């Protein structure tokens, strides 16, 4: 049986956006070929999947608390837009829940202003989604809205917020394939260069319900042409391929501009961040970044990186047990590495019983190479390469976010 959707809700979803005025002026963001505002009382877009972003509702009184505006994949337009929408209807559904969502309103071609578009509605009985595909400049774009939909009241609230926010938002979208200018202009030479690194202390709440302090690390790479990358650049310290970063929908890079005694970072998605000069370094977001030296190409490593963690539940929480884990990677000067990781969960040892589940993953290891400021891992058995930044900071050697226990030597 198809999930039920109120008739008024479906009628509203059939693109009232085509004639609805957009929201008031808001901060603009960019993701791939789409330029869009952040609606009032919605959070800035976030996402761990490189192909999508979500803007969570932040409406007063927890109204539609779990509602999200969704920005998904895009592709070259080919064939029927409604068929493309149907083929991608599970893009915003967790992999282990994809069989649970049933279509309540099949993909239907409906124009959105002068653009071809299609709409589909689906639900798993507790959550509902309305998906929209829009063709612009020869490309298909997938957008969506989801929220609670377990009963008539939840459906009504979700539908009302959709009508008030998502539908007007659709009318404000701009598309780079139609000639809309990027929010990130061409860079201007900025005079910065090299790798900068810093750390800060964060307070977090552990599974044992106790507050803990842990260090967070940050790296930012600058190039003289005015480009920066926040994190691990795909090409390391080699000159960045801005076109490839843009095409890959990467949002961790952008332009920097020196202004007076400070600096402004403008990310590819439109976010901005200010940095202030502090001695020889820069302070931003709680981090003080100082310039560090990348390891030279061909550096040989003799040592290891390791970690171990444990968390348990505090007395009085009604729970016992916890989780632990650890890992170690050993590097040899001849270019080999080997590693292992282990993890386990356990319960109620305090009462003398307990159980242990989980196990180890003894990695076969492989070869490593230092190039362009990166430590590149080439695993055995044809697995994909991965890389972390490798550099000297003060008297330590950092491999990604780990301190090396050992030594490095120059290439032979």
Name these PLM-found stretches.
Residues 8-20:
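Bacterial N-terminal signal peptides
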Residues 1-5:
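N-terminal secretory signal peptides that target proteins for export/translocation
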């Amino acid at each position: 049986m198809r999930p039920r959707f109120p008739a008024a809700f479906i009628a509203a979803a059939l693109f009232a956006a085509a004639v609805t005025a957009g929201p008031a002026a808001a901060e603009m963001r960019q993701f791939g070929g789409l330029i869009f505002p952040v609606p009032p009382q919605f959070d800035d877009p976030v996402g761990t999947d490189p192909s999508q972003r979500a803007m969570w509702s932040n409406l007063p009184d927890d109204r539609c608390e779990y509602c999200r505006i969704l920005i998904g994949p895009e592709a070259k337009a080919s064939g029927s837009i409604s068929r493309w929408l149907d083929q991608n209807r599970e893009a915003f559904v967790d992999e282990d829940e994809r069989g649970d969502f049933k279509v309540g309103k099949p993909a239907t071609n409906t124009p959105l202003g002068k653009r071809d578009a299609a709409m589909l509605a689906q639900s798993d009985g507790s959550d509902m989604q309305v998906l929209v595909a829009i063709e612009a400049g020869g490309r298909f774009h997938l957008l969506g809205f989801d929220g609670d939909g377990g009963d008539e009241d939840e459906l009504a609230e979700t539908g009302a917020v959709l009508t008030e926010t998502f539908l007007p938002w659709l009318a404000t979208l701009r598309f780079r394939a139609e000639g809309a200018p990027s929010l990130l202009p061409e860079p201007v030479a900025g005079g910065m260069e090299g790798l900068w690194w810093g750390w800060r202390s964060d307070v977090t709440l552990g599974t044992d319900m106790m507050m803990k302090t842990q260090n967070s690390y940050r790296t930012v790479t600058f190039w003289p042409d005015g480009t920066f990358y926040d994190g691990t650049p795909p090409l390391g310290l080699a000159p960045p391929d801005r076109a490839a970063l843009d095409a890959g929908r990467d949002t961790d890079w952008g332009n920097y501009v020196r202004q007076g005694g400070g600096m402004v970072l403008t990310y590819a998605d439109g976010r901005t961040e200010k940095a202030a000069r502090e001695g020889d370094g820069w302070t931003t977001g709680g981090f003080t970044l100082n310039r560090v030296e990348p390891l030279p190409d061909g550096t040989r490593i003799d040592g290891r990186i390791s970690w171990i963690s444990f968390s348990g539940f505090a007395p009085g929480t009604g729970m016992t047990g916890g989780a632990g884990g650890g890992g170690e990677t050993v590097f040899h000067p001849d270019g080999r590495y080997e590693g292992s990781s282990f993890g386990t969960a356990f319960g109620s040892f305090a009462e003398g019983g307990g159980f242990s589940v989980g196990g180890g993953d003894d990695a076969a290891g492989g070869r490593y190479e230092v190039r362009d400021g990166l430590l590149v891992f080439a695993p055995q058995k044809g697995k994909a390469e991965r890389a972390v930044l490798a550099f000297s900071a003060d008297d330590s050697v950092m491999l990604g976010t780990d301190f090396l226990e050992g030594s490095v030597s120059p290439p032979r």
